[in-house]
Amino acid sequence: MTARILDGSKIRDQIFAELKDEVRLLTSAGVRPGLAAVLVGENPASQLYVKSKIAACEEIGLSSALLTPPATASTLELLAVIEDLNRDNDVDGILVQLPLPPQVDTKRILEAVDPAKDVDGFHPVNLGRLVSGRPGLVACTPAGCMEILRRNEIPIEGANAVVLGRSDIVGKPMALLLMHANATVTICHSKTRDLPEVLRRADIIVAAMGKAGFVQPDWIKPATASKPGAAVIDVGTNRITDSQEAEHLFQNFPERLEKFRAKGSALVGDVHPDAIRSAGALTPVPGGVGPMTITMLMSNTVKAARLRRASPKFSATQSTASAR
């Protein structure tokens, strides 16, 4: 059987339509949500990412501002930029594009952002809110994964869910979100024993390890005539350039192999492409989780605008680094 494809681009379009309506309502009430992006230096990849985020703001009607400190900016200079944005009532969300230059203390910069404006969901205060189940801003990629599951009506409550990876940005918040949705959650990592057996029991797999084609098809609960098989959310985005690796991964996908040979590289997830023949449902790479990250950034910006105005305490919360 062939897995059902969980198309992130379609869900992106659905959510963008909903956000446009909400932004119109807020704007008519005198509140136009706004996002400020801080791009340090002239890294081409970072410039491209920020450009796509600004374009998304324009698409749904958010105001946006781009601040471009030089690549030589110091930690103290960037802290001053963040402080100004924290105080600006027209700014609901602050995005610091990573990576920052090596002379900058990245952790200190991220923790200086007002948690109420932390639309990336990286701040320890927002992670703490997630742990306790309180309203807050959730890291964009895990939030996007949850939207994929819910909007495709994948059963979560009571499901055995396995999260591969334990990063602060994806793995840990993903596990918490699944737990709050009443799944039974297992977090796996490089020290996990008998990983294939753990995965074979999973109804939901979220792969976020950063290893191309790591999860093998026979590690995934297969779909049968009476059971749906595992739903696989592939967060990995790995660019491969080795021809032998490509031939191994794409041996059953001649079109993808031809594209690799023509381009010299390809994007693959953490799940082997052959999993499409074993899983019950699967996010493609590219086109699955990827479109959802910017989508949830936009959603968080609108959410921040609501929360800041509805809850003065939430808006007033400042990080220790920011207070210094």
Where are these regions (language model features)?
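Adenosine-phosphate binding glycine-rich loop
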Residues: 2, 9, 15-21, 25, ...
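Short beta-strand elements in bilobed, periplasmic/extracellular small-molecule ligand-binding domains
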Residues: 35, 57-71, 185-187
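Short, well-structured alpha-helical segments in soluble
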Residues: 77-89
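Short glycine-rich anion-binding loops that position phosphate/pyrophosphate groups of nucleotides
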Residues: 96-103, 211-213, 237-240, 288-289
